[in-house]
Amino acid sequence: THEMQIVKDIANRVAVMQNGKLIEEGSVLDIFTNPQNELTQDFITTATGITEAMVKINQQKIVQDLPADSVLAHLKYAGTVTDTAIINDIYKQYQVSANILHANIEILDNVPVGEMVVILSGNAENLASAQSNLQAAGVELKVLKGGI
């Protein structure tokens, strides 16, 4: 992960190799926000620290006993979506609150790139609308766990 920090700081293009063969190449921004190859995806997941964070998050009581009106979600976003207060907006529009359990934002090639793990809470209809709104705004949203 230390080496990846150096790559993020000084490079604008990156190539990923496995067993002496090129498996993926692109801009640092593209590789970190949309890795295509499974090995690259695993590498980026490790380099961003989300794997380690998820181990700790899944041990939290609030996650283990997730309320029925809640979902645990992983949000990834880049570029202009960071220009708006998306978490505040879903609360104002849909009365869906977000409990931020993990967040990270970096600047890659002068573009803000972020990810969060949140518990979104609200009534079922509003929760679905808020999720759709986030996705329409350009947020990649993956529900990791639904409330029981």
Residue ranges and their predicted role:
Residues 1-2:
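H-loop/switch region of ABC-family ATPase nucleotide-binding domains
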Residues 7-11:
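A short, surface-exposed alpha-helical micro-motif characterized by mixed small hydrophobic
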Residues 89, 129-138:
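Short amphipathic alpha-helices in soluble, non-transmembrane regions
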Residues 45-121, 128, 143-148:
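ABC ATPase nucleotide-binding domains
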Residues 13, 25:
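Short, glycine/charged-rich "phosphate-handling" switch motifs in NTP-dependent
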Residues 29-33:
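Short acidic-hydrophobic catalytic motif
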Residues 17:
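Catalytic metal- and UDP-sugar-binding loop of GT-A-like glycosyltransferases, i.e.
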